[in-house]
Amino acid sequence: LAAEGLFRASILADLAMIMADVAIGVAFYYLLKPVNQKLSLLAALFRLAQAATLGINLLMLLIALQLLTGDLYTAAVGPEAANALAYLFIVAHDIGYKLALVFFACSILIQGYLLYISRYVPRILSVLLIVASLTYFAYSLATVALVNYDAYAGMFEMALVFIALPAELLLALWLLIKGVNLEVSEQRNTVEQMPAEALSN
């Protein structure tokens, strides 16, 4: 393995990303819980399912690393077989990563809907997040459903780069710079409570 240190660093970076994603999922749960507790919980569970899938999927890279660096394995099966097996596990990791995006797509689809009805952020950002979720769905499912996926791989990857990623980036920047508009949600809740209070009186 020519760059073992870089390979190990990439595994650690993935692990850090997974842990951060769990924290983000929990934060969104508490943010959207007042809007709809059940849907917010469902979105968080999908996020955790994605994190669990990605965490297990890291084992593929660790096994590949052992095959490429462990003299015992090379001696047992031969260098060519060890390299072939390592490549197989790296390919399996790539497939597992794409399948995990199904859970991510479900999570941000629900979050996009809840953000839309809550008006915590401008609705255009919520719509873009929903569109991003559909893009992730299409990308992930196409890798399994399409026999000739390689012929369309470039198109799906371009959709991620120019649709899904900008939508996520815009929402993240808005939340970091502007935050959420809790006043709009509070006003909406007040309006919804007024008819009930009028009836009780």
Residue ranges and their predicted role:
Residues 1-201:
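Hydrophobic, aromatic-enriched alpha-helical segments typical of multi-pass transmembrane helices
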